[in-house]
Amino acid sequence: MAALVVRGVRDMLKRADFATVPRRQRHKKKWASTEPKFPATRLALQNFDMTYSVQFGDLWPSIRVSLLSEQKYGALVNNFAAGDRVSAELEQLKARDFVNEAVFHREPEPENSQTAAPSPASWACSPNLRCFTFTRGDVSRFPPARLGSLGLMDYYLMDAASLLPVLALGLQPGDTVLDLCAAPGGKTLALLQTGCCRNLAANDLSTSRTSRLQRVLHSYVPQDVRDKNRVRVTSWDGRKWGELEGDTYDRVLVDVPCTTDRHSLHEEENSIFQRSRKKERQMLPVLQVQLLAAGLLATKPGGHIVYSTCSLSHLQNEYVVQGAIELLDNQYSIKVQVEDLTHFRKLFMNTFSFFPSCQVGELVIPNLMANFGPMYFCKMCRMT
């Protein structure tokens, strides 16, 4: 009986399609020449597991699963369109304006508080910004933005944590502003939404990225505001800005190229973790120090600078801030003071999850209940 079963199986194998394939045409499946054998996304995760498990300890598993999960977005209302109508429509979706909720409904500090009161400059938030998010734990999505009656898009979808560096910059009416690494344009658009920029210089080294920035501006900003006397878009080497326009700006945003941690875990295209870009990735902190130093040199004495990344790495965050401050002190005898943003963290803790142990600045860490970020930002004042 057993012999009959074996013979039957053998006959079935002989009749199977793959049994008729000539031996010379049988081969193992090979990777396409354009498909990496070890994807950049896997390299990124391997790198993060090695470094961030040490940096964040017990917090890393929670951050890790959040990074690998769907990101949460905010809707930045376009004040140049019918802003009040758009806000009402977003409220009907049960979304909330987290900026208005935090800034205008903050609780006053108790009189017997032991913490030192922050300076008025560090308290200031850039005005007129409206950004709606869904509450913690609500994973609803915003519908795609529409073209309004004025020919401009109603709102801009972005990681709501990306708005924090702009808020921290504390723009005042009539400020001259530099966005040193402006593309793809979300923060530049937010700067213009404040209505405070007497003129704005938006720069990015990549011409393809500045083209994308221009498309964002054309979709959201009226022609008269985009006038070259008010908004100037350039593709210069940001590291040389201190030589080009030193001591010029009231406010400077330095949102540097970084490992873009969340993007690197989900996208293969143009990933900084591609093997061909290994040296570029290793040199990122050097580039970041150079860009921040240039931004500080471009700032007027008494002006303010915000440095930001979308990376969790303290090598790209706190260490870069400290390195640039030392560089300016040693080479230019320029003193820079880091602003305390503890109060800022308290303002927005209902919307974002903050890492509690940054040496300088603040870091939004991804959390499944509030899956924004990562976003690091540090505010500085150029003293001399």
Curated annotation (Swiss-Prot):
Read off the SUPFAM superfamilies from this record: S-adenosyl-L-methionine-dependent methyltransferases
Q: Mind listing the GO molecular function terms for this protein?
A: methyltransferase activity; mRNA (cytidine-5-)-methyltransferase activity; rRNA binding
Q: Classify the main location.
A: mitochondrion
Q: What is its EC number?
A: 2.1.1.-
Q: Which residues bind S-adenosyl-L-methionine?
A: 185-187, 204, 209, 237-238, 255
- Active site per database record: 310
Q: Which residues carry this modification: Phosphoserine?
A: 206
Location in the cell: Mitochondrion
One GO CC term of this entry? mitochondrial matrix
Q: Give the matching InterPro entries.
A: MeTrfase_RsmB-F_NOP2_cat, MeTrfase_RsmB-F_NOP2_dom, RCMT, SAM-dependent_MTases_sf
Q: Which domain of life is it from?
A: Eukaryota
UniProt entry keywords in alphabetical sequence: Methyltransferase, Mitochondrion, Phosphoprotein, Ribosome biogenesis, RNA-binding, rRNA processing, rRNA-binding, S-adenosyl-L-methionine, Transferase, Transit peptide
Q: Which reaction is the catalytic activity of this chain?
A: a cytidine in rRNA + S-adenosyl-L-methionine = a 5-methylcytidine in rRNA + S-adenosyl-L-homocysteine + H(+); a cytidine in mRNA + S-adenosyl-L-methionine = a 5-methylcytidine in mRNA + S-adenosyl-L-homocysteine + H(+)
Please state what class of enzyme this protein is: transferase
Described by its record, this protein's role is as follows: Mitochondrial RNA cytosine C(5)-methyltransferase that methylates cytosine to 5-methylcytosine (m5C) in various RNAs, such as rRNAs, mRNAs and some long non-coding RNAs (lncRNAs). Involved in mitochondrial ribosome small subunit (SSU) maturation by catalyzing methylation of mitochondrial 12S rRNA; the function is independent of MTERFD2/MTERF4 and assembled mitochondrial ribosome large subunit (LSU). Targeted to LSU by MTERFD2/MTERF4 and probably is involved in a final step in ribosome biogenesis to ensure that SSU and LSU are assembled.
PANTHER family reported in the protein's UniProt record: 5-METHYLCYTOSINE RRNA METHYLTRANSFERASE NSUN4 (PTHR22808:SF3), NCL1 YEAST -RELATED NOL1/NOP2/FMU SUN DOMAIN-CONTAINING (PTHR22808)
Assembly and partners are described as: Heterodimer with MTERFD2/MTERF4; this interaction seems to be required for NSUN4 recruitment to the mitochondrial large ribosomal subunit.
- Name of the protein: 5-cytosine rRNA methyltransferase NSUN4
Organism whose genome encodes this protein? Bos taurus (Bovine)
Q: What is the lineage of its organism?
A: Eukaryota, Metazoa, Chordata, Craniata, Vertebrata
